[in-house]
Amino acid sequence: MSTSTFNRRWAGVILEALSRHGVRHLCIAPGSRSTPLTLAAAQHPAFTPHTHFDERGLGHLALGLAKASGEPVAVIVTSGTAVANLYPAVIEAGLTGEKLVVITADRPPELIDCGANQAIRQHSIFGSHPAATLDLPRPTPSIPAAWLISAIDETMGALAAGALHINTPFAEPLYGELDETDLTWQQAPGEWWQTTTPWLRYEKIQAVSAQADWPFWREQRGVVLAGRLTAQEGEAVAQWAARLGWPLIGDVLSQTGQPLPCADLWLAHPRAAALLAQAPVVVQFGGSLTGKRVLQWQSECRPQEYWVVDPLPGRLDPAHHRGRRIVADISAWLEQHPAHPMMPWDEPLEGLAAQTQRIVARELTEWGEAQVAHRLPELLPPDGQLFLGNSLTVRLVDALAQLPAGYPVYGNRGASGIDGLVSTAAGVQRATGKPTLAVLGDLSTLYDLNALALLRDAPAPFVLIVVNNNGGQIFSMLPTPAREREKFYCMPQNVCFAPAAAMFSLNYDAPESLAALKEAVTRAWRSSVATVIELRVPETAGAQVFSRLLKAVCA
């Protein structure tokens, strides 16, 4: 049997084993060393292939697919720096829990550290960021297929969240006709090929046990803090908190409907902390909190009990409260801890939030990114989804908008980087097929500009709003040195995105008022071609308006 044929069979077994663990989407970059994997993937009926020429964007595309589907997603790349380009996506998956299966083709061992072309040290290249790493040997018939299958089953069976890095070397030749004369190695697993289940099945028993003293605590005053949740979890948490009569502080990614809107503003009011301090227990669901004032309150509050409930491992509490870290499925935990109907105790907080919302509506009458953030719910497509970028964009929406409960909202708030955001949004849409609104800043869009190529194949209307405030204006909200701020922090690029949209044959619009923006978005929802909408806004106006609102709320 030729080397190229056995490489293909080895790769085919890897992918077949992964398909038994729910992998449906494969993201593939061009490359020669990965040929056995690519050809095996192309011929496998269980996979939906996605391609992209930029491995960094490809990793984020896979991240978005995993984020929205809730399934493991595989990535195939060739050897060399192609592997290193996946690093940001691997880091984000490790922090937010998406299951990424990163399959990296490698040179065989004798070509490492000897000057061979495109050969780097890929062993443990991602350091501690993957949840698991599997370094496979050079394909050889002397290693039974059952070993290879069970190695995949073991790592996938134990993978609760995060990335799995599978490094697999392939020797040349990589090309050639598939030799069908000797199938002994491939056929050794027997009837496994006719089934759809793993060779080695790992049983996970994840029963959620109730907190023994919950009947006591549910009778007390409490506060619910909601971070990043799914739409289903967000609605359930909101209903649970309302039934308990506990105030709910919801992050922009909580999908709870934020019943106390504009929390990142009203928490700056002197009365807020004192009112919340009346609660002896705080229950936090999910991590990745966005708002500065929310994080400050979370850090400074000192309840008798602080509980963090999330399926991901780790503390998820940068303030290091004394309390309980409950690793559990949130929906299952809520079922085990039913709410006892209580009268709300947070009327003063409701009044504070309502007053803040009135101030926001009164102040935000002029065109700009703050007004767009406040009125963003009016732009959402029915039965669609929202993807928010990082930096100033997500903070303004978090503080100024009240998003509908249960409306899907996505973002990369693990490492909160501005890389790969267009790619991630494209992956989110490919997983769901829903109309998608993405809102990013100009630097974030520039950072991932070639990912506009991914929007050419959008399965539903896609609107990318680029808030062009000419640089990283988040630094205008920070105490950066005034003299160095523009050159070394904000870094204005003075660009227009119309040529970029034209390059990738996308629609383009540049409205200059809220009414014109609504008209542009309405047109875009009727188009089968993705639309880039550029909002050219005053550079520092967003930061200045936010500062003014904080002062007005605290007055």
From Swiss-Prot:
Catalytic function, reaction form: isochorismate + 2-oxoglutarate + H(+) = 5-enolpyruvoyl-6-hydroxy-2-succinyl-cyclohex-3-ene-1-carboxylate + CO2
GO biological process: menaquinone biosynthetic process
Keywords, sorted A to Z: Magnesium, Manganese, Menaquinone biosynthesis, Metal-binding, Thiamine pyrophosphate, Transferase
Coiled coil ranges: none
Cofactor(s) demanded: Mg(2+); Mn(2+); thiamine diphosphate
Any Pfam family hit: TPP_enzyme_N
Pathway: Quinol/quinone metabolism; 1,4-dihydroxy-2-naphthoate biosynthesis; 1,4-dihydroxy-2-naphthoate from chorismate: step 2/7; Quinol/quinone metabolism; menaquinone biosynthesis
CDD domains reported in the protein's UniProt record: TPP_PYR_MenD, TPP_SHCHC_synthase
Cofactor binding description: Binds 1 thiamine pyrophosphate per subunit.
Enzyme nomenclature, EC number: 2.2.1.9
GO MF, one annotated term: manganese ion binding
Domain of life: Bacteria
Enzyme class, spelled out: transferase
Function: Catalyzes the thiamine diphosphate-dependent decarboxylation of 2-oxoglutarate and the subsequent addition of the resulting succinic semialdehyde-thiamine pyrophosphate anion to isochorismate to yield 2-succinyl-5-enolpyruvyl-6-hydroxy-3-cyclohexene-1-carboxylate (SEPHCHC).
NCBIfam families, sorted: menD
Family (UniProt): Belongs to the TPP enzyme family. MenD subfamily.
Record's subunit section: Homodimer.
Name used for this protein in its record: 2-succinyl-5-enolpyruvyl-6-hydroxy-3-cyclohexene-1-carboxylate synthase
Species: Cronobacter sakazakii (strain ATCC BAA-894)
UniProt lineage: Bacteria, Pseudomonadati, Pseudomonadota, Gammaproteobacteria, Enterobacterales
Gene, per the UniProt record: menD
